[in-house]
Design a protein with these regions (language model features):
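CBM-like carbohydrate-recognition segments
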Residues: 2-58, 62-106, 145, 152, ...
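The core hydrophobic/aromatic register in alpha-helical repeat solenoids, strongest
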Residues: 59-62, 115-118, 180-183, 187, ...
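Extended ligand-binding groove/face enriched in aromatic
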Residues: 71-186
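Active-site cradle of extracellular carbohydrate-active enzymes
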Residues: 171-180, 193-249
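Oxyanion-binding "anion nests"
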Residues: 239-255, 259-282
Length: 444
């Protein structure tokens, strides 16, 4: 236990996920029940790579604060290898088999973020090389095969980047730019840093030009229909949050970004987007809330990115008048998640911040907290998958729900850590590497 409830909460969520969803004998991550985000692999309910990636990101985040889970991260790394496609040099959505082309760029960006972050913070040089080599392979795949050479932006899936059914998404473009920067912090080669930072800035400019609308928030993406690119104006916390986080990280590369085109706009981009993200009358907030504090209208594994983005903004732009509000929003959302999305029976988390989608009891809680008048709206993803009325199916917890919650708590913990030990710049500095190979490291 530490003196920080957010750090303790995040670490506890990781440990409970490890005990509940990781099979140490087979290096598999799955569920005893058929829950959302799993697929049937010979009778076992195995998690799709997205869930494992979010858990890996949360594990990597923990290394900023403690080496407690360094060995466990190796186990997760072994698990991720089961999804690895040698054809793509990236992870498939499910376990790899020859001919498996179900490969998503946003999934792989989150895998790369986990590996690059772990590589940056690990205290062992052997692990660092293994993690960063794999992260570099993924980023090369993203840049070479994901970026649309004609329109710009990053495709969602390897089969959705070109006509007749092309999609260029905020989730993929923002997450890939964030992954590139996490890797740029971890590598030493100046040329590689330059290439990664340039790619990330290109992604930000594309998002600003194509997906940011009059609200100042990031829309979901572009779809090609009958030769015309149509904008999906849906606003998810994921997209605005990841874009904020990317811009915050960019400001840590002062010497590199000086020569980038239009880089003088980055501060206004950041300020305007943070302001929009903090507008509680906006689309990312649940407007059924009648109180000053409104919960985000999303799930934990989307909202995690907005927590990270607002936290990053607050340290990248320390003189902004929005810093205090941004940090308070991170705390308030984290408090809500710990108090109401966490199931005290097992310490794991549900998925929805809009808890009226979980149970009648939590609907009553929501209405009481927010002076709202919501009706119970059962979400099938909060329940064991099956037939019959959704509300009759048993409630369940998932890897991605709890991992997303952990990643909402760690930004709050980072704010506290920096207040106790002031440190400038957009990211916490890495713990010093040992420079020695770990003989007990079974990935070496």
């Amino acid at each position: 236990m530490t003196s920080d409830k957010y750090l303790d909460g995040g670490l506890n969520a990781l440990q409970r996920c490890y005990k509940s969803f990781f099979d140490k004998l087979s290096d598999k991550m799955g569920s005893a029940e058929n829950v959302s985000g799993t697929y049937d692999d010979g009778g076992s309910h195995i998690y799709l790579v997205w869930s494992v990636a979010v858990y890996a990101e949360a594990m990597a985040d923990s290394l900023k604060f403690t080496n407690k889970y360094e060995k466990k991260f190796e186990n997760v790394f072994q698990c991720l290898k089961r999804y690895w496609s040698p054809e793509y040099n990236a992870c498939c959505a499910s376990y790899y088999f020859q001919g498996n082309n179900d490969v998503y760029f946003d999934d792989n960006a989150q895998v790369a973020i986990a590996l690059a972050t772990a590589g940056y913070y690990t205290s062992n040089s052997s692990r660092k090389k293994h993690y960063l080599d794999r992260a570099e392979a993924i980023i090369a795949f993203i840049i070479n095969q994901g970026w649309n050479q004609q329109k710009g932006g990053v495709a969602w899936h390897v089969n959705s980047g070109s006509p007749p059914h092309a999609n260029l998404n905020a989730c993929s473009t923002a997450m890939c730019s964030l992954a590139a920067l996490r890797l740029a912090y971890a590598v030493d080669d100046p040329k590689k840093k330059q290439q990664l930072v340039t790619f990330a800035w290109n992604c930000v400019q594309w998002i600003e030009s194509n997906l940011v609308d009059h609200t100042g928030l990031v829309c979901d993406g572009l779809s090609l229909n009958n030769g015309k690119w149509d904008l999906d104006s849906t606003k998810f916390t994921y997209n605005t949050g990841a874009t904020l986080a990317t811009m915050a990280l960019l400001l840590g590369f002062n010497d590199i970004i000086k020569g980038l085109p239009n880089i003088d706009k980055i501060h206004s981009y950041l300020e305007n987007m943070a302001s929009a993200a903090l507008n509680t009358s906006g689309e990312m907030y649940d407007q059924s809330c009648k109180t000053n504090f409104k919960v985000w209208k999303d799930n934990t594994f989307f909202a995690q990115h907005l927590s990270e983005g607002l936290m990053g903004f607050s340290f990248a732009m320390p003189n902004s008048s929005l810093v205090k509000s941004a940090q308070q929003m991170v705390f308030d959302q984290a408090d809500f998640v710990m108090n109401h999305v966490r199931d005290p029976k097992d310490g794991l988390y549900f998925r929805d911040l809009n808890i009226y989608k979980i149970s009648p009891e939590l609907t009553n809680t929501f209405n009481k907290i927010f002076h709202a008048d919501q009706h119970f709206q059962p979400d099938k993803d909060e329940r064991v998958q099956g037939s019959g009325p959704v509300e009759k199916l048993p409630l369940c917890k998932s890897l991605i729900g709890s991992s997303g919650a952990a990643r909402m708590l760690f930004p709050a913990a980072e704010i506290i850590a920096r207040k106790n030990n002031p440190q400038s710049g957009p990211i916490l500095g890495g713990r010093p590497a040992s420079g020695e190979k770990d003989k007990g490291c079974f990935i070496c």
